[in-house]
Amino acid sequence: MFAITGGGTGGHLAIAKALAQEAQKNNQQSIYIGSQIGQDKTWFEGSSLFTHCYFLDSTGVVNKKGLGKIKAIFKQLKAAWEARNILKKHKIEYVISVGGFSAGGASIGAILSNTPLFIHEQNAIKGKLNEILTPFAKAIFGSFEGKSKNFIHTSYPVRDEFFTHSRVREKLHHLLFLGGSQGAKGINDFALQIVPELLKRGITIAHQCGERDFERIKKAYEHIGILDKVDVFAFDKEIVLRLQKADLCIARSGASSLWEMSANGLIGIFVPYPYAAKDHQYYNALHFTKQGLGLLLRESQLDMLRVFTFIESLQKQEDSLSEKSHLLMSKIQPNGAKEILEHITSLMSH
């Protein structure tokens, strides 16, 4: 039996879920150790993927100052002691951390109990916790470049449907704006500027603007007089079908989104979230754009001229779109979670 820990936000939790599902397929039992704060409970409370789920009283340390930081460190140490006892109780063979602040307790607990620790780093720049824990880990897995001696490159765990619904793009007919489930105001506002011109050029538009911004964006399109020409929606659980239909996507550059688009063969214009820790979204996107697989623009650089120059370069150069689409699909293989678990099995047997 092994333990999965970490989460807080959807990107980390999606990795945890992929690993748990793969383990369950192989009749491997696992427990989950997360936090009472963040999305951990929403995702896994009562989940049949795990034999037991524990949500410890822990919080993030990095963004705290003064007394708040001291309290957060104390909570993490208390959670680490609790996790140590949980690991012993279930005779856990190893711990897999998927990152995020809620991984702190069980990861430190693993070190305290001498339980092998494996880490998955989802971003191009290591999170603070993963940076601290790397020397103590048996291996660290990632899909971007890694510099540590114990780094093992694997495909990013992406759901099968992003591969099965993939296609090589030949022509640029349909553009998808992904403002995210929360709504990225910078992307949403830029869409309002550029969409009328895109429509004039014969490009059809779908726009996910997030629950919070849906009414404002809908009214704005109505005011411009193009609401009937734009497929505007707040959120769609079947986002894979939206990606499949698109020939180009303007989106943030969280790791999951990037690799899902890569698996799907969809080229992106990436607008990193400006307040992401260590600016990791910028470096995530840079991994792709330095290979010519997309365009990277800071929110402050978003303007129609830059975007249309990029669109025109894709339209004018014969085979440019299909070549990039092919290259994106070749960067990632299915079964990323299986690959990680196989590496762990091999390392544990030595």
Swiss-Prot record:
UDP-N-acetyl-alpha-D-glucosamine binds at residues 9-11, 123, 159, 181, 281. GO terms for cellular component: plasma membrane. It comes from the Bacteria. GO terms for molecular function: UDP-N-acetyl-D-glucosamine:N-acetylmuramoyl-L-alanyl-D-glutamyl-meso-2,6-diaminopimelyl-D-alanyl-D-alanine-diphosphoundecaprenol 4-beta-N-acetylglucosaminlytransferase activity; undecaprenyldiphospho-muramoylpentapeptide beta-N-acetylglucosaminyltransferase activity. SUPFAM superfamilies: UDP-Glycosyltransferase/glycogen phosphorylase. InterPro entries: GlcNAc_MurG, Glyco_trans_28_C, GlycoTrans_28_N. Pathway: Cell wall biogenesis; peptidoglycan biosynthesis. GO terms for biological process: carbohydrate metabolic process; cell division; cell wall organization; lipid glycosylation; peptidoglycan biosynthetic process; regulation of cell shape. It catalyses: di-trans,octa-cis-undecaprenyl diphospho-N-acetyl-alpha-D-muramoyl-L-alanyl-D-glutamyl-meso-2,6-diaminopimeloyl-D-alanyl-D-alanine + UDP-N-acetyl-alpha-D-glucosamine = di-trans,octa-cis-undecaprenyl diphospho-[N-acetyl-alpha-D-glucosaminyl-(1->4)]-N-acetyl-alpha-D-muramoyl-L-alanyl-D-glutamyl-meso-2,6-diaminopimeloyl-D-alanyl-D-alanine + UDP + H(+). It is an enzyme of class 2 (transferase). It is a peripheral membrane protein. Its EC number is 2.4.1.227. It holds the Pfam family Glyco_transf_28. It is found in: Cell inner membrane. Keywords: Cell cycle, Cell division, Cell inner membrane, Cell membrane, Cell shape, Cell wall biogenesis/degradation, Glycosyltransferase, Membrane, Peptidoglycan synthesis, Transferase. The keyword Cytoplasm does not apply. Cell wall formation. Catalyzes the transfer of a GlcNAc subunit on undecaprenyl-pyrophosphoryl-MurNAc-pentapeptide (lipid intermediate I) to form undecaprenyl-pyrophosphoryl-MurNAc-(pentapeptide)GlcNAc (lipid intermediate II). HAMAP family: MurG. Belongs to the glycosyltransferase 28 family. MurG subfamily. This is UDP-N-acetylglucosamine--N-acetylmuramyl-(pentapeptide) pyrophosphoryl-undecaprenol N-acetylglucosamine transferase. The lineage of its organism: Bacteria, Pseudomonadati, Campylobacterota, Epsilonproteobacteria, Campylobacterales.
